[in-house]
């Protein structure tokens, strides 16, 4: 079987790239051939994450949108004729349009899947999702967004995203030790990640706490400055971007009370799954989409309404005071359906079903 993954150029540093790379690597082990095709304006895409993956690119910096699209569609149709895939999986919504048009132009009949990794409510051209035949939703929230745009529910499969099982658990601080929180992600002061809410909440929390921040982004210095403004900077350790953040958490931080996520929206926050796979509970905004699929209150963490700083502070205070007792050793079992073996079983069945229906 041959699979084509297509999409616009990506940054190369996010959770989406990690998932795509892992899926292609696993498919290769199952003797499923995969190649990628990117639509690019220039050659600036970081390609480090594509090591070992065969890929092609269509370049166009034509300013007129319809001409730029026509060039990409022509390039894709030629590539499809050469590669002859059994299935096309689009990693973003605009690619669904390109794939549908290129399929027609190439004369090759193969099923087209959408596999968007971001909330459709916060993406341009989300209506093009309907150009795909079938849909892989990474969260229940994204499934609903697809339905809201006219996609038939029968064509949608919620597959989530996979996480590796771990061979150890990161413990909580002992009673009497300082509560230790971590944030692992991009530095966006407001916008999607709302690190401002995280800092505001901690500044109002009672008792002793420490925050370790692993991540970089356009607002890194702004977030640091705000920490100083709130007079909490002496309790925050800023690490910047880390290639292996969880190794740093395990080896240097050692004990963690909870991971914090204060986003206004997500696609499917892998940072929650990673934390839980290490036995770390999570305090997360119940934003669209993903956290509600992952977090089970009192079992592996807690949810609060996005923007409800008072609700966030209440949870922080309970964790700091030791009023919440979640056994870290039991947390990894709470995300059993997200581990790789079950994920690939789901994905394989969906793909085989689509191909057999097409024949």
UniProtKB/Swiss-Prot annotation:
Disulfide-bond pairs as recorded: none
What GO cellular component term, any one, is given? Answer: cytosol
Q: Which GO terms describe its molecular function?
A: lipopolysaccharide-1,6-galactosyltransferase activity
InterPro entries, from UniProt? Glyco_trans_1, Glyco_trans_4-like_N
Name the EC number(s).
Answer: 2.4.1.-
Its GO biological process annotations read: lipopolysaccharide core region biosynthetic process
The protein depicted here goes by the name Lipopolysaccharide 1,6-galactosyltransferase
> Which species expresses this protein natively?
Escherichia coli (strain K12)
Gene (UniProt): waaB
